[in-house]
Each structure stands twice: as C-alpha cells, then as structure tokens.
C-alpha cells in the first residue's frame, strides 16, 4: 500500500513511491486547494489520485499482459442487445461499446465495456479472450476483435481528470517517482441529451491525436460548425482539447474564463489551448493513461 503526506505543499512523500511537483507547463496553474466562487473551495484530490496509482501498481504487478478494449464508431461491430436493452445495468450505453460476456455464457453479453478502457488479458482463445477490467469488478470474455494488446505493462504517463472539481493533472513516472507536470482548470461534459453527455468515469488509454478535430453542428450529419485544436482522444468521441473555434473564425483561441467552472462540453475535456498543446505533444498513443474521477 502506498501512503503519503503533504510536505510543505510541494511534494507528496510515499513509502513505496513518491509524487513531486516538477511542472513542465506552468500557465494557469492551480493550487492544491483554491477558492471557487464567493464561499466554496475546490481542490486536487491527491488521496484519491494516490489510491489509483497504488491500484495501478498492483494491477501491473499482478497481470503481465495489459491492453484495452476498442470500438470507436462501432468499427468492430455494434454489440448485441442485453435483454433487449441498449444500456446495461451500470448505465453504460451500447453505442461504441464492447460486449462483455460471463465466462459460462457466451451467447448474450452481460455488460457493456467502454471504448478505450484499460484491461488485463488473462487468457487468449481462438475467438475470445478472458480479461479483467481495471475499472469494474469481475472477469469477462471479450471477442478478440475488440481487444488490443499493449507492448508494455509499465505505464509512465498518467492524466487525472476530476469532474467534481473541474481540474486536470498530468504526471510522468521517473524511476519510482511520479512527477506532476501540470495542474490546470478544465470543463468536462455536461448531462444535456441528446447532444451532450458527462465525460464517463473510468480508466482509459490515449488512442488518437488530431491537430484539429472538426465538429458538427448539433443535429447535423454534415455541417461543420468549427474545430477544437490539439485533440487527444481517450474514449468514444471524448477528447482532451483546446478552446473550440466556431466558424467563420479560424484562428485559435487561447483561454476562456469558463474553464474550471461547470461542465459545459459535449463529452470532451476542454483546456486552455496552450495546455491542450502540451498534452498533445507530451502524451503517447497507447502509452498514456487517462483517469476520469469524481
């Protein structure tokens, strides 16, 4: 078990690992605890972050082969309904999901897995693999076409997105020390169907990067409304990106005073554009973890 205490507000000392602040991006940096509005405060949830890092260390030691499940835009096939329903008992929707089967029943999926989720690969068979999800209980059988193996089981880049406090942390693991690289405000996805949804909780792999991610006008299948710069995708259509630019404007926008306030995005995580560029340049596809927490 990794334990820590705050030392002079500068570093977190651990008995098995260490978290230290050594920023590589230092614009719009937030304090460990900071004022929000007139009467409330927000914070970086270091205890919760430490718990996840502790769990990750155990996960990596327990399972030699890691990977992630993927079905962006249903590229690997839309999964079957669960008892006629398009959402599972945990609230995970069918769209762009991965079918999770009980090992003793491969006829109908029992749950849906979220695109990009971190998993351990326990056993491989001709058509299915037995996996253990990092973010949910149980072992599951998954059709092999939805599963991607990762070459290493020792992650050294992590991003924590906090929906409750509307902030983000980026971290590098150097030897046994996790270095905090940035601490910044964001806005996450809001619950406003049918076009907006909360950024889903879970642990994901960075899967894709786009210098400019084009987005459509709500309700349209072909009208481009604008673009989001330095977009890094981690699950379904959820990206970390800079401030959106609505056409006819084309030049990038650096900052919005709405960052760090309330959820406002469709599902994405909106950053200052220079911070989005930092994440875009710093992160590694299939090698960077994204933890979405509350």
Question: For the regions a protein language model found, what residue spans apply to each?
Answer:
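Sec-dependent signal peptide recognition
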Residues: 1-7
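SH3/SH3-like beta-barrel superfamily modules
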Residues: 19-70, 111-146
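Hydrophobic h-region of N-terminal signal peptides that target proteins for export
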Residues: 7-16
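Short, surface-exposed secondary-structure edge patches
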Residues: 107-112, 195, 279-282
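Exported/periplasmic cell-wall-interacting domains
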Residues: 18-59, 213-294
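Short, flexible surface segments
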Residues: 115, 200-201, 285-286
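Non-catalytic extracellular/periplasmic "stalk"
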Residues: 74-156
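Gly/Pro-biased beta-strand-loop elements
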Residues: 124, 143-250
């Amino acid at each position: 078990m990794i334990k820590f205490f705050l030392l002079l507000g500068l570093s977190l000392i651990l008995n098995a690992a260490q978290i230290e602040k050594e920023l590589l991006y230092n614009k719009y940096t937030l304090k460990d605890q900071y004022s929000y509005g007139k009467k409330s405060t927000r914070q970086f949830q270091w205890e919760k972050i430490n718990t996840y890092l502790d769990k990750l260390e155990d996960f990596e030691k327990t399972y030699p082969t890691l990977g992630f499940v993927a079905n962006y835009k249903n590229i690997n096939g839309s999964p079957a309904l669960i008892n006629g329903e398009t959402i599972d008992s945990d609230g995970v929707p069918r769209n762009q999901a991965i079918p999770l089967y009980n090992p003793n029943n491969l006829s109908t999926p029992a749950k849906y897995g979220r695109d990009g989720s971190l998993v351990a690969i326990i056993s491989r068979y001709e058509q299915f693999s037995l996996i253990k999800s990092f973010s949910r209980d149980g072992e599951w059988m998954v059709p092999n076409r939805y599963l991607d193996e990762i070459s290493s089981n020792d992650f050294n880049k992590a991003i924590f997105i906090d929906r409750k406090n509307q902030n983000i942390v980026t971290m590098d693991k150097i030897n046994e020390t996790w270095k905090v690289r940035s601490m910044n405000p964001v806005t996450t996805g809001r619950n406003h169907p049918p076009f907006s949804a909360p950024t889903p909780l879970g642990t994901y792999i960075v899967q894709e990067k786009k210098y400019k991610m084009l987005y459509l006008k709500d309700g349209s299948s072909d009208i481009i409304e604008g673009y989001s710069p330095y977009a890094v995708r981690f699950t379904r259509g959820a990206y970390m990106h800079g401030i959106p630019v609505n056409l006819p404007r084309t030049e990038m926008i650096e900052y919005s005073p709405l960052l760090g306030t309330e959820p406002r995005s469709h599902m994405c995580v909106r950053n200052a554009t220079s911070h989005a560029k930092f994440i875009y340049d710093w992160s590694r596809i299939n090698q960077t973890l994204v933890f979405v927490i509350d």
